[in-house]
């Protein structure tokens, strides 16, 4: 007897009664489930026969973009808590009811942020995680911290671009020369000579802190798409690109400061810009923890690596040397510029030799003057003043709207409702003058034809009776 079409059932020769048994293709066939929500929506899912309840909730969480802790599944009035689906009698074509869970009461404030981060990361697909860690696409997360909602967008630097790598090395050498550190700037001056016009070093202003030419999107820690980095950028050595994690460190500022070779795992904020109250952006760089790296030194493709990057970024210390100046700082630089600026830093340069030839004494003097002109406390006070000003303006707007609504209600309840034609005629008659006192008539807002008071007396009665 030949096997039946489709290969779902296979029969053996010599079996009594031509008995057939299920083949491996039928055993591994996925089962189809119909998920019905309480709002009337239906979802069809194909899951393996040995799927667990936790795996099914994770699939629904990724599809609906809802944390799996907020999903509850029912099968014939039985809640699926844990274990395999077959243990609850779920088979091919079964109908499951999706019920959202409602939280009531108080929650632990200490466990909220971590749960929120994990819920946001668990809803990511493997493609999103891989694209983010390789620098192909940004990662956008919506996090809840206490009673506030926070949107975070991260972008790691792209890899495998030697020309852009030279640009980062030249920028690192420029920053090292601006700080007057010859031990770091001298070994990088030789590989920085063949910089092409496409990767030309940006013009360095007279102030020692170079400005960042790369655009930074508001509200996101995103590096510029044209800038790349690798861990050797921290050491200013252009060799061996696989010694540390390439996707963990990002930068988009040419003022990124080189760090020593024995750098501890963690992140450093290179630049930080406050665009508006509650809206920030900047760049960061760092080294991944060894537990998040594979044998070749590359970051592991899982959500644990992203969680480690987020934790390092939250615990990172502010790094002011690579911070792009704001408008207030640029005004302060113009006022507090040194008396004898370095002439070698004014024109556009394409090699590192001119940068290393700059005298370091005037640069250090300019740094001290800028720090005296713009202490860190003033920036914090400006942020607080801006936030207070926004709150006051919002309160004034709310009060103005409240006054307008109150006036509209008062006008609607008024005793006199004059038509526009009568008002126009009244204004014309009052302006033309004539008779007694037109100002009083216009002030009272009455017509000349209408009397102020009409006696409720029968007009047939004689006047003598009225007087008496």
UniProtKB/Swiss-Prot annotation:
Please name the InterPro entries in this protein's record.
Midnolin (IPR039336), Ubiquitin-like_dom (IPR000626), Ubiquitin-like_domsf (IPR029071)
Instruction: Please list the GO biological process terms of this entry.
Output: negative regulation of glucokinase activity; negative regulation of insulin secretion; proteasomal ubiquitin-independent protein catabolic process
Q: Which GO terms describe its cellular component?
A: cytoplasm; cytosol; nucleolus; nucleus
Stretches the record annotates as Disordered: 182-264, 404-447
In its UniProt entry, what is this protein called? Midnolin
Q: Identify the species of origin.
A: Homo sapiens
| Recorded GO MF terms | kinase binding; molecular adaptor activity
Classification of source organism: Eukaryota, Metazoa, Chordata, Craniata, Vertebrata
Major place of residence: nucleus
Keywords on record: Cytoplasm, Nucleus
């Amino acid at each position: 007897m030949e096997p039946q079409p489709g290969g779902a059932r296979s029969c053996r020769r010599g079996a009594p009664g031509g008995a057939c048994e299920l083949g491996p293709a039928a055993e591994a066939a996925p089962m189809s489930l119909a998920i019905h929500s309480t709002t009337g929506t239906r979802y069809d899912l194909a899951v393996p026969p040995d799927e667990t309840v936790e795996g099914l909730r994770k699939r629904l969480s990724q599809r609906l973009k809802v944390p799996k802790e907020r999903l509850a599944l029912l099968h014939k009035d039985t809640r699926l808590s844990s274990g395999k689906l077959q243990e609850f009698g779920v088979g091919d074509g079964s109908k499951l009811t999706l019920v959202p869970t409602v939280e009531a009461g108080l929650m632990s404030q200490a466990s909220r942020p971590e749960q929120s981060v994990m819920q946001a990361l668990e809803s990511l697909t493997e493609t999103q995680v891989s694209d983010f860690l390789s620098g192909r696409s940004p990662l956008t997360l919506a996090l809840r911290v206490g009673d506030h909602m926070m949107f975070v967008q991260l972008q790691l630097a792209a890899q495998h671009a030697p020309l852009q790598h030279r640009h980062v090395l030249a920028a690192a050498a420029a920053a090292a020369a601006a700080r007057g550190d010859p031990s770091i700037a001298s070994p990088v001056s030789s590989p920085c000579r063949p910089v092409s016009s496409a990767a030309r070093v940006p013009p360095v202003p007279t102030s020692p802190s170079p400005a960042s030419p790369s655009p930074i999107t508001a509200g996101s820690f995103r590096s510029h798409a044209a800038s790349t980095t690798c861990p050797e950028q921290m050491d200013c050595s252009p060799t061996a690109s696989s010694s540390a994690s390439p996707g963990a460190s990002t930068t988009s500022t040419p003022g990124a400061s080189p760090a020593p070779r024995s750098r501890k795992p963690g992140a450093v904020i290179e630049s930080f810009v406050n665009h508006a109250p509650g809206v920030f952006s900047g760049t960061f760089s760092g080294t991944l923890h060894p537990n998040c790296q594979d044998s070749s030194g590359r970051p592991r493709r899982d959500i644990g690596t992203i969680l480690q990057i987020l934790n390092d970024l939250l615990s990172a210390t502010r790094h002011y040397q690579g911070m792009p100046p704001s408008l207030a700082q640029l005004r302060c630089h113009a006022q507090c510029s040194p008396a004898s600026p370095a002439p070698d830093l004014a024109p556009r340069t394409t090699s590192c030799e001119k940068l290393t030839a700059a005298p370091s004494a005037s640069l250090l003097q300019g740094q001290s003057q800028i720090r005296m002109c713009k202490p860190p406390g003033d920036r914090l006070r400006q942020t607080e003043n801006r936030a207070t000003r926004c709150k006051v303006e919002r309160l004034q707007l709310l009060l103005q709207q409240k006054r307008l609504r109150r006036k509209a209600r008062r006008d609607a309840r008024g005793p006199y409702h004059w038509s526009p034609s009568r008002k126009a005629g009244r204004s014309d008659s009052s302006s033309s003058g004539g008779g007694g006192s037109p100002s009083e008539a216009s002030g009272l807002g009455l017509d000349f034809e209408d009397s102020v008071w009409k006696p409720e007396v029968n007009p047939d009665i004689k006047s003598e009776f009225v007087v008496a």
